[in-house]
Amino acid sequence: MQIKRSIEKIPGGMMLVPLFLGALCHTFSPEAGKYFGSFTNGMITGTVPILAVWFFCMGASIKLSATGTVLRKSGTLVVTKIAVAWVVAAIASRIIPEHGVEVGFFAGLSTLALVAAMDMTNGGLYASIMQQYGTKEEAGAFVLMSLESGPLMTMIILGTAGIASFEPHVFVGAVLPFLVGFALGNLDPELREFFSKAVQTLIPFFAFALGNTIDLTVIAQTGLLGILLGVAVIIVTGIPLIIADKLIGGGDGTAGIAASSSAGAAVATPVLIAEMVPAFKPMAPAATSLVATAVIVTSILVPILTSIWSRKVKARAAKIEILGTVK
């Protein structure tokens, strides 16, 4: 049976299928973890420890050395994405109620959901798209996108926008596994190779545990809103990313569109933030569902939009070249 190959045909499948299975488990048998106990309970409820190991391995997979072009392109995209998420947070905090919207079509929408959906780029999706439509250097620009993974950037955005306050030691605790992994991976290439193999392996495990915090009725209630959130992520982050790629990154805007997705890891952010700041706990389930839907939507639309943009840019460049030759 080609189970893995079938799952991978779904955009973000290795994250979203286990997430859905976990949500099924939580919806129809919410006490399963307590009933079975031991290791089974650990797999069902172990979101934070599994993610801690994943962050460590993610840090170890990042190589410090990179060309100037790669760093400029990567830095431009990462900083722009984070800056846009900060602006969205600052505006949303003045419009959306403190505990999120509780009634009506926008029920479940919160500043936490908006920031979590917008501040992280799907690095793997970006790299695969740019390998097809961009240069080798542009494809390699995902190197710094891994720094967005995890709750740290979301914490910084929420903190600096005045939406939440975090003690300094909480910031350190959030980033420490990543930094230790990063240090070890760059001190020893063999360790980097060893730990980086676990990055993809751990995704289904933390996705399943994360799914066990979601009730499927919440997903049903936020489905259409989640689709609109996914479209909003592409528009709100995509336009500034295109402009930044052209003006600062030295590109033609293709990399900007390719970076306008939501990362699968962003699905875990609301729960992790809620663990650190209990005030966010009531919003976390709906925010998780919204972000999960946004991940699916952006994973489907971003490759299509990038393809269309790239074709138009290349056609325009070819036309200009022909006109220049004629003259």
UniProtKB/Swiss-Prot annotation:
Keyword annotations from UniProtKB, A to Z: Cell inner membrane, Cell membrane, Membrane, Sugar transport, Symport, Transmembrane, Transmembrane helix, Transport
Listed GO CC annotations: plasma membrane
Claim: Nucleotide-binding is one of the keywords in the record: no
Residue stretches spanning the membrane: 10-30, 42-62, 73-93, 95-115, 139-159, 163-183, 199-219, 224-244, 254-274, 289-309
GO molecular function: 2-keto-3-deoxygluconate:proton symporter activity
Subcellular location: Cell inner membrane
Topology of this chain in the membrane: Multi-pass membrane protein
Catalytic activity line of the entry: 2-dehydro-3-deoxy-D-gluconate(in) + H(+)(in) = 2-dehydro-3-deoxy-D-gluconate(out) + H(+)(out)
Membrane found in the keyword field: yes
Main location: membrane
Pfam families: KdgT (PF03812)
Family affiliation: Belongs to the KdgT transporter family.
Function: Catalyzes the proton-dependent uptake of 2-keto-3-deoxygluconate (KDG) into the cell.
UniProt protein name: 2-keto-3-deoxygluconate permease
Gene name, Swiss-Prot/TrEMBL: kdgT
